[in-house]
Design a protein with these regions (language model features):
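Conserved nucleotide-cofactor-binding alpha/beta core module
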Residues: 84-206
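Short alpha-helical patches at coil-to-helix transitions and adjacent helical residues
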Residues: 10, 74-78, 100, 104
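N-terminal auxiliary segments of SAM/dcSAM-dependent transferases
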Residues: 1-53
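Generic structural signal for secondary-structure transition and capping sites
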Residues: 22, 46-49, 136, 181, ...
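Glycine-rich, flexible loop/turn motifs
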Residues: 46, 50, 55, 60-62, ...
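Conserved alpha-helix/loop element of class I SAM-dependent methyltransferases that forms part
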Residues: 19-20, 24, 37, 53, ...
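SAM/dcSAM-binding transferase cores
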Residues: 1-20, 156, 174, 183-226
Length: 226
């Protein structure tokens, strides 16, 4: 499949995301996502961040397997989570769960610096290679336990988590700057919610449930490292 074919498929996907946003107005409180987010989604070629054999399916609005029992998230969910995060050009963003780097690349289009943690070494290596090939030099990838965050680079303006703990890990709350935002799926597998957490200037955290989701468990990922 040629790049022009991918371009047409990507444009169709962006239109689908826009339509789903309209239908999700009651959850999101608005009928359109930030144009900066949609522009970033348009700039990042999703087919470069999926396994080669799945490239023909890269622009279907669905999760896709990337190996090791993991998936690349549904593009609509990637767009919504990025929009909720409200990334600014001066922001340092912590991402938990690099996968093959698709969400990292979206964030890299918007932020000053992205720090991403991936538990599985092979996925982290593949992500680094893909990000480098696409010219995203403002992403640092670390192999490790995402529940611990990345203290050496904290505090962070924004935090995004792509696997679901039952409760928000305390280290991630601690490493979020006052005035910062975190987007994270959390809860039991049968009752997960996408959550927007905001830390006020006094350091208190408030949370808002956005809508039900289903992500892999962050605790399961931690168990793999023991």
């Amino acid at each position: 499949m040629s790049d022009p074919d991918f371009t047409a498929l990507q444009q169709h996907l962006l239109a689908e995301i826009a339509a789903k946003t309209i239908f999700s107005t009651s959850y999101l409180g608005k009928a359109a996502l930030d144009p900066r987010v949609m522009d970033a989604m348009a700039k990042v070629p999703r087919h470069e961040f999926v396994p080669l054999e799945l490239r023909p399916f890269a622009y279907i609005d669905t999760p896709l397997p990337i190996g090791y029992g993991k998936t690349i998230s549904q593009p609509f969910i990637v767009a919504v989570m990025t929009d909720l995060l409200d990334v600014q050009p001066t922001d340092a963003v912590l991402e938990i769960g690099t996968g093959l780097g698709y969400q990292s690349a979206i964030l890299a289009e918007l932020a000053r610096q992205v720090y991403s943690i991936e538990l599985i070494e092979e996925l982290a290596t593949r992500a680094m290679n893909r990000l480098a090939r696409q010219g995203h030099l403002n992403v640092d990838v670390k192999i490790g336990n995402g529940c611990h965050g990345w203290p050496e680079h904290a505090p962070f303006d924004k935090v995004i988590v792509t696997a679901a703990p039952e409760l928000i890990p305390p280290a991630l709350i601690y490493q979020l700057k006052p005035g910062g935002k975190m987007v994270i799926p959390a809860g039991l597998p049968e009752a997960q919610q996408l959550i927007l957490a905001e830390k006020d200037l006094g350091g208190s955290l408030s949370t808002k449930d956005i809508f039900p989701v289903l992500f892999s468990s962050l605790e399961d990922e931690d168990a793999e490292s023991r």
